[in-house]
């Protein structure tokens, strides 16, 4: 039966496409689907995802609650009055427990409301008036802190729990950094630690950026959801809003950098330094007087409970939790963990982490690395089995999976690590015994072998980039006897990376520390990640070298994200991928979900909330001087065509009001275009195309090495547009302005896409990717050898085109941000006329595409655009 509008508890009157999305989402969650949702930015997608998923979750919980009550009976053979009593008693106990929490949170909320009128003391009461001192000062850490503990590889399974060791030894460097932030444990007794009777279904909400998770928290504040207890089982003394609403319990978890309130730690120069200092202050051999005074301990249970109730009473963002921690005098980073058990919604900022997922959570939001990497989920004890996963802004999901499981190491990093290990080895030579001495020697031999091969590549006349074989890296003396898996276990267990980095930092001249402290994790973490890549199936990934500015880097690239994501798909109840521009969707179906039965797969692409007359899209094949726009690799440097492009853009800027954003395929190509535009035109008395465009609209340009920040460039652009002259902003596909930046209203009346931003097909990485797709398709195809080869070539070509068109669609999505917005989209290249290319555009763009013809002159397009904007000015 189709759900009605009010069933989703949307805070506003939803548009029809929002209703369609929420209905489809509800159905997919109920049926356990794997689905891809495309809903343009500006259509209220995030709020629709929240309302649709929370409505389903509350319905599901009510059903589960009723089932639990019905199952609480003694025996079906008992008298009916006894069965009824058992059901009522079970209902009363479960309801009272939940109501008690609601009443406590309501009391706290009212207290906060009363305090809001008072000026808060920014310092707040301190729990203990003392601060940790720098580790290098007298009374801090000694050299003994950095010595390795004895290690016995024959008894490795007893030195650390096997499951924890297996999980953490397989993490990528970026995820190891996340996990290191959570190694310290809170010693406080867990308040309200009653175990749930069963593992309630949760929603894992995953997004990429700080701003997206901040937006999620903001949208959540608007939502009011009904009780998760069946209405006929609720206590009769609930009235008014209390009867209708059960608050959504939410907590935002952040990194130490976001939440640390110890000024001696939070003032350090980067996140890595903050994390390391915090962990160092918790080591057992640190003098208690020098430990962090805000770290929760057993005697701080009252403050932890107070923090929990305040955090849950209203939806708070990361800044609110920081202020709350200062006011109570307790570390909000660790205290926020106590909130998780009773929360329904748990937000994590990008580069944040969780250390467990209690049964009572209903919604868990987290950054990509901790969801997409199996070893991270296991190390955090966070199973997704039977739960729902919603990944928002998922247009780059396949790339994200590949990047998370890819590792890069440079020759300079290898040389630095060798130097640090040598210094460390000399200092602790007499204390390195047995297996420690053996493994440290193995690390040095392996790093030396890899460094020697990279050095030979750097000094050779070989191409700037190319593939590398594992055997080439392991060619050093004695390296073939090394067991990479045992060595990687040793690196993680012994904490050699932290010991070496800590000692080097400890002995560095204090005057050099601020300038020389690296903003990244210790290089041995990168080495560890690289060692793990050597154990991956060779068919799924490749090794590449790349020479850059006197250095050379070695990269393991995961080519196929399918198997890395498969466990999530098979374990989860439902998987939802959502984004503003998910087209083209064939990659998800053919590659990421190729093993999923068709009956479980679904795709949805919704239109925009704007009326059809508010968007016009054109392909532009020829310029105002008749040049055919062909920006293929072999033709794109034609000066005649580039000059005509400039004249055409000048003409378009004359008819498109306010702000126009033009996207080019790359920084290098934009630079070449600008150089040609600034040349004097023949017979024009020194006039340049650049000046010609500037007469219509002032020009601003993005560059790889901008002297201003992106925010400053956007601020200048907005001010120029507001001045009344409008502006032309030259940008790059995949650059700083192509994703996450909104060009709404006057800032984006026109969006021009110049050329198609195909990746460099000649690069070693892309040749390997396409070769892998072709080989995989050939193996899976049926029929004759000729037909299998054709299918393989078609699959490789489709994969290559999809990568390009996803980038194009992201740029197009920068315009049109709300219902009353309007804009023109112009696709400048003859290849946009191809049906296969147009088929990869989002549905909401295709339906606004003006019928095109290769023979149409540019003047006809200009007239069409002039008519479109004239209709908006009346």
UniProtKB/Swiss-Prot annotation:
Q: Spell out the GO cellular component terms annotated for this protein, sorted alphabetically and separated by semicolons.
A: chromatin; nucleus
- Between which residues do disulfide bridges form? none
Compartmental location: Nucleus
Q: Could you state a single Gene Ontology molecular function term?
A: DNA helicase activity
- Name the cofactor(s) required for activity, per the record: [4Fe-4S] cluster
* Top-rank taxon: Eukaryota
Its recorded reaction(s) are: Couples ATP hydrolysis with the unwinding of duplex DNA at the replication fork by translocating in the 5'-3' direction. This creates two antiparallel DNA single strands (ssDNA). The leading ssDNA polymer is the template for DNA polymerase III holoenzyme which synthesizes a continuous strand; ATP + H2O = ADP + phosphate + H(+)
Q: Which PANTHER family match?
A: ATP-DEPENDENT DNA HELICASE DDX11-RELATED, DNA REPAIR DEAD HELICASE RAD3/XP-D SUBFAMILY MEMBER
Specify the protein name: ATP-dependent DNA helicase chl1
What organism is listed for this UniProt entry? Answer: Aspergillus niger (strain ATCC MYA-4892 / CBS 513.88 / FGSC A1513)
The encoding gene: chl1
């Amino acid at each position: 039966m189709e759900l009605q509008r009010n069933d989703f508890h949307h805070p506003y009157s939803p548009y029809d496409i929002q209703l369609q999305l929420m209905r489809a989402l509800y159905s997919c969650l109920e049926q356990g689907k794997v689905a891809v949702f495309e809903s343009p930015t500006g259509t209220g997608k995030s709020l629709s995802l929240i309302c649709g998923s929370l409505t389903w979750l509350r319905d599901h919980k009510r059903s589960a609650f009723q089932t639990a009550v019905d199952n609480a009976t003694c025996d079906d053979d008992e008298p009916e009055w006894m069965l009824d009593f058992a059901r009522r008693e079970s209902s009363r106990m479960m309801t009272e427990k939940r109501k008690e929490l609601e009443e406590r949170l309501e009391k706290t909320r009212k207290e906060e409301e009363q305090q809001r009128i008072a000026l808060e003391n920014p310092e707040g009461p301190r729990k203990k008036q003392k601060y940790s001192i720098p580790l290098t000062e007298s009374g801090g850490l000694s050299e003994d802190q950095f010595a390795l503990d004895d290690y016995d590889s024959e008894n490795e399974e007893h030195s650390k729990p096997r499951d924890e060791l297996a999980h953490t030894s397989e993490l990528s460097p970026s995820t190891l950094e996340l996990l290191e932030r959570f190694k310290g444990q809170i010693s406080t007794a867990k308040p309200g630690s009653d175990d749930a009777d069963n593992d309630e279904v949760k929603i894992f909400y995953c997004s990429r950026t700080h701003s997206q998770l901040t937006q999620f928290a903001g949208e959540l504040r608007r939502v009011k959801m009904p009780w998760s207890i069946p209405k006929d089982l609720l206590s009769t003394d609930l009235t008014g809003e209390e009867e209708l609403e059960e608050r959504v319990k939410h907590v935002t978890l952040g990194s130490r950098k976001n939440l640390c309130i110890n000024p001696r730690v939070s003032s350090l120069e980067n996140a890595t330094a903050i994390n390391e200092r915090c962990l160092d202050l918790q080591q057992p051999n640190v003098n208690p007087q020098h430990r962090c005074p805000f770290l929760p301990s057993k005697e701080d249970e009252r403050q932890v409970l107070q923090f929990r109730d305040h955090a849950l009473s209203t939806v708070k963002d990361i800044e609110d939790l920081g202020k709350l921690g200062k006011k109570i005098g307790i570390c909000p980073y660790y205290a926020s963990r106590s909130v998780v058990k009773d929360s329904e919604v748990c937000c994590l900022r990008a580069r944040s982490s969780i250390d467990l997922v209690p049964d009572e959570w209903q919604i868990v939001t987290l950054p990509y690395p901790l969801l997409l990497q199996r070893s991270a989920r296991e190390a955090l004890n966070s199973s997704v089995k039977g739960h729902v996963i919603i990944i928002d802004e998922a247009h780059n999901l396949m790339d994200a999976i590949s990047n998370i499981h890819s590792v890069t190491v440079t020759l300079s990093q290898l040389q630095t690590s060798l130097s640090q290990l040598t210094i460390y080895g000399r200092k602790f030579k007499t204390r390195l015994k047995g297996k420690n001495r053996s493994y440290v020697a193995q690390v040095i031999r392996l790093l030396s072998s890899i460094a020697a091969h990279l050095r030979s590549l750097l000094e050779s006349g070989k191409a700037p980039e190319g593939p590398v074989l594992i055997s080439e890296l392991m060619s050093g003396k004695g390296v073939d006897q090394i067991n990479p898996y045992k060595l990687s276990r040793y690196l993680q267990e012994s904490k050699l990376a932290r010991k070496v980095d800590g000692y080097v930092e400890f002995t560095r001249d204090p005057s050099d520390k601020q300038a020389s402290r690296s903003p990244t994790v210790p290089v041995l973490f990168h080495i560890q990640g690289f060692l793990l890549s050597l154990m991956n199936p060779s068919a799924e990934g490749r090794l590449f070298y790349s020479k850059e500015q006197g250095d050379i880097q070695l990269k393991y690239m995961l080519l196929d994200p399918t198997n890395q994501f498969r466990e999530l798909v098979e374990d989860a109840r439902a998987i939802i991928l959502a984004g503003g521009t998910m087209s083209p969707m064939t990659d998800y179906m053919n590659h990421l979900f190729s093993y999923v039965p068709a009956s479980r797969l679904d795709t949805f692409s919704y239109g925009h909330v704007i009326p059809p007359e508010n968007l016009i899209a054109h392909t532009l094949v020829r310029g105002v001087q008749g040049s055919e726009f062909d920006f293929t690799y072999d033709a794109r440097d034609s000066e005649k065509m580039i000059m005509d492009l400039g004249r055409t853009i000048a003409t378009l800027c004359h008819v498109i009001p306010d702000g126009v954003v033009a996207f080019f395929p790359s920084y290098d190509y934009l630079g070449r275009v600008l150089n040609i535009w600034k040349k004097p035109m023949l017979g024009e008395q020194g006039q340049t195309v650049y000046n010609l465009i500037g007469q219509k609209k002032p020009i601003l340009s993005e560059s790889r090495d901008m002297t201003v920040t992106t925010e400053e460039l956007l601020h200048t652009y907005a001010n120029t547009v507001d001045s009344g002259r409008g502006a032309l902003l030259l940008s790059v596909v995949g650059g700083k302005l192509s994703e996450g930046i909104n060009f709404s209203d006057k800032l984006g009346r026109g969006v021009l896409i110049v050329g198609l931003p195909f990746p460099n097909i000649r690069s070693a990485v892309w040749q390997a990717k396409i070769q892998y797709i072709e080989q995989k398709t050939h193996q899976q195809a049926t029929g004759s050898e000729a037909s299998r080869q054709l299918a393989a070539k078609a699959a490789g070509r489709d994969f290559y085109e999809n990568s390009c068109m996803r980038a194009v669609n992201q740029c197009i999505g920068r315009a049109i941000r709300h219902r009353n917005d309007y804009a023109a989209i112009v696709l400048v290249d003859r290849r946009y006329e191809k049906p296969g290319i147009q088929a990869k555009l989002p549905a909401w763009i295709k339906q606004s595409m003006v019928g095109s013809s290769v023979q149409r002159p540019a003047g006809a397009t200009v007239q069409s655009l002039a008519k479109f904007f004239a209709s908006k000015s009346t």
